[in-house]
Amino acid sequence: MLSISNLKELSFLVYGLGITGQSVVKFFKKNKIKNFTVWDDNKKLFQSNRAKNLNEVLNKVDFIILSPGISDIKKKNLNKFNSKIITDIDLFFLTNKNFKSVVVTGTNGKSTTCKLISHLLKKNKFKVLLGGNIGTPILDLKITKDVYVVIEASSFQLSHSKYIQPDYAILLNITNDHLDWHGNLMNYMNSKLKIFKSQKKNQFALINGKLEKIFKKRNFFSKLVVPKEKIYKKIKYKIKNHYLKSNINNENMSFTYTFSKLLKISKKSFISSMSSFVGLPHRYEIFLKKKNVIFINDSKATSFESAKYALSNSKNVYWILGGKPKKNDKIFLSGIKKNIIKCYVVGKNIKFFQSQIQNKISYSIAKNQKKALIKILNEIKLSDVKENTILLSPAAASYDQFINFEKRGDEFKKLSKFYARKFI
């Protein structure tokens, strides 16, 4: 651990002034750490403390705190300074003590699992804070003694982290994602596995069973715990929560249940706590039911692996698909195409998605959500199917038409409510 007085003897470059970078600057100013400079390609973002000669600063500083949004450090000529690069989460672990940390990562389910664990802790009278990639930047949190800090860590953050040492490190899953950022699956996997690298023998590693062999080969020191879905399923029926009844949350819940047992939270308390949990928006969000139609917003599904969960857990689906596809993503429909009545392709990459689904399922080109919904609702009016599902689960990023998945999901909900009144 480093004290604030130790930090004052070191020099820093804050590279990238997005939300994370601005949080680091705020942390330095609050603690009267003056020996720092900043750099961002957008010269309008920050004028004071700005590096005048970037190469000179890179060579002189002790640490470079890199924004998680900066992908290719080679293009930025930063790779030769890799030993100096750290992240805001490193700074958090280096400067805080007397707290318990739960760091969650994985391709799918990070945010939901963080919220589940945070909710569980609050309901069982633990002091808890939630931050990192979800909500509050980690350095903005006010740490008090014995507080549990639940941190969502993305692969971008972990890729350059060196000092993360969680009491409970959770790796939910790894599938093809962010390969445009990491280059290949092995780099992506290695960034996720860094969550365990600095753990001690008295700390816990909760890991997906499919990754157990890889974990053991790396000779990590922490106590390995592999959650079992079949154990969670024995109590699942007792949880009175419609959102958690779906199989889509089985993995998130099995990790949360395993974590609860490590803290010796009783089964009864776990069941009671989970019954009051409210799910996050844009994650298999059932937001409207009208007559024989269920509307589900799963805008957070930015890869097919994510969308597959929603398709597997829905019936008679009118599926809205499309956006900016992830690198090397493939659509495999075996085992789930029976759930799909028809697919509606939207966005600016129609040819890509068309090539993935043609000759597999019935589909229509709709270009945007509005046109898709009008087509779907007209077809439902002519259908004799008793219960229909309109599912936005795009299997792609939103950036072709929206600034983020939240805006995409909000637009879908707004349009759905409007056209449901007109057609149903």
Where are these regions (language model features)?
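Phosphate-binding loop of NTP-binding sites
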Residues: L10, K26-K29, E56-V61, P68-A205, ...
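Short beta-strands and strand-loop turn motifs
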Residues: W39, E152, L171-N173, I390-A395
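C-terminal helical cap/extension that packs against the catalytic core
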Residues: D329-E387
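Residue-level signal for inorganic ion chemistry
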Residues: F28, I64, V104, N133, ...
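Residue-level detector of alpha-helix initiation sites
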Residues: I19, N108-T112, N250, A301
